[in-house]
Amino acid sequence: VITASSAPNIIDPVNGKERFSTSEDIARIARLIDGLPAIDLFSVSVLASDAPAGQYSLSRFYTALKHCRKPVRGSGDPGVDCESILQLAYAIAGSEAAYKARPFITHHYCPVISPLKMDENSTELLMFYTEQGLPSHSTVVPNAGLTSPMTLVSTLAQGNAEFLALAALMQMTKPGTPLLY
């Protein structure tokens, strides 16, 4: 079981009013998830409006990993952001080899833009993590009547076609890559 992710706002647990979420909210939720036996993986639930400029993803991962012993799922941007997340993971694990032997971050991307198109950045990142042999979780999100046909069977057919395209891409990138369907 995985938590939801990336909400920009939160209902303040003290005053009940909606506000931008912060790193402290990530920490609070991470501690809660850490103690819930029915949750297997923490998908960083909220954004961190207080993250330093240029360290948005790193700030989210650092806070989540500091406060939750379960695997963490999240995403980052190509380039420096992606590299800083990996450097954090290597430091926590003790080395790059130790992290790759037992990775605790699942990199989550939505490379398919329904209907049947692929986003360049997310696809690039999916291929990068696949090449590295690191866990990636890809989501396909066809919406019946909006980005896919109106009927349930047609939406399921399109969603499966989109997932199969991702599966084929991952297998072409690194044959034998495990997939989560």
Q: Which stretches of residues belong to each language-model region?
A:
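Glycine-rich, N-terminal phosphate-binding loop and its surrounding beta-alpha-beta segment
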Residues: 1-14
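Helix-rich catalytic cores of soluble enzyme domains
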Residues: 12-181
